[in-house]
Amino acid sequence: MTNGNGATPEAAPPPQLNVLAQYIKDLSFENPNAPQSLAPQGQPPQINIQINVGANALAETEYEVTLTIEGKAESGSQVMFSFELVYGGVFRLVNVPQEHLSPMLLIECPRLLFPFAREIVANSVRDGGFPPLMLDPVDFVSLYRQNMERQAAAQGVQGRPS
């Protein structure tokens, strides 16, 4: 196929995603009841995990994406351990249409960061005297949708007259 002057139209360049850096931005592990918490317990602790994703622009095509993972293990009323990890990455996104930018930053980039963050959590918990905590894979698509629904609901509440 040619355009009016006989030249073939150039295809749009494909989107590019590059990881420029990965790093621990914040890491905290607490074992407040050691050494008693390290003794064998009657039943496994209840472990609650919270995961959040954020992104902000650094330059025209560079973005920082942060993956925050917080967790707490409790046995009855006793806290066995708690942790917080903020793991960051700097990404370059080129030729990404504006409508795809948010999903790339909040789904694809965290998906690339997660295995490294998971290993840091497992090692931190192990180094705290407990068996390594192997986090289950995260469905970042569902997390993205939940956050979008929450934002839409919050905007709906703000937009309503009192």
Swiss-Prot record:
This is Protein-export protein SecB. It comes from the Bacteria. Signal peptide: none annotated. Gene3D superfamilies: SecB-like. Disulfide bonds: none annotated. The gene is secB. It is found in: Cytoplasm. Homotetramer, a dimer of dimers. One homotetramer interacts with 1 SecA dimer. One of the proteins required for the normal export of preproteins out of the cell cytoplasm. It is a molecular chaperone that binds to a subset of precursor proteins, maintaining them in a translocation-competent state. It also specifically binds to its receptor SecA. GO terms for biological process: protein folding; protein tetramerization; protein transport. One of its GO terms (cellular component) is cytoplasm.
